[in-house]
Amino acid sequence: MFLDLVQRRNPDLIRAAVALHQRGIIPANTYVIDLDTIMENARAITATSKETGVQTYFMSKHFNRNPIVSAAIVQAGFPGIVAVDVQCAKAQWRYGNPVQHVGHLVQIPKHEIPHVLEMRPEVWTIFSLENAKLLSDAAEAMGMVQDILLRVRAPE
């Protein structure tokens, strides 16, 4: 399905990847990314978000947390990334990419909270009152206030 879309929209990318692989320049299981197209799409999304007043973030897990791709998307106008787990936050932060939203899929472990707070995310998703208390205590100890998003689920 995904490859069909790439074949229609960007056949040159596929041709280049095949040629590079067949010449032994890139090995199998290598990500081949069209950074120009990614930046073009990021600029279009950013322009629309500004027109509509909707805040946007991007998930670097979709391209294996590649810090070069993340930096290009930020350069194109996105404010920062959604870190779906602490490893993602650390990987992006290490390369200077802004981490704007944490805890989206996996809660940040309690002993990692102070380090992630140092990243100054705009928002932090919380799944439970216990995690809210852990975050609040850590933020207060650091003299900070952290905005949160609550993950709400229907009763099971």
Task: Please state what every model-predicted region is.
Residues Q22, R43, H111-P114:
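Non-catalytic helical/linker scaffolds that mediate oligomerization, partner binding
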Residues G24-I25, K50-T52:
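Short hydrophobic "helix-edge" motifs at membrane interfaces and signal-peptide entry regions
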Residues H21-V32, S60-I68:
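Glycine-rich, proline-tolerant flexible connector loops at the mouths of alpha/beta enzymes
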Residues V32-L35, M39, P67, L129:
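Non-membrane alpha-helical structural segments and their capping/turn regions in soluble enzymes
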Residues P27-A28, L35-I38, I45:
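N-terminal, Lys/Arg-enriched amphipathic/low-complexity engagement segments
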Residues R43-E51:
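CE4/NodB-like, metal-dependent polysaccharide N-deacetylase domain
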Residues M1-P27:
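Alpha/beta catalytic barrel-like cores
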Residues Q55-E156:
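Active-site-proximal beta-alpha core segment in soluble small-molecule metabolic enzymes
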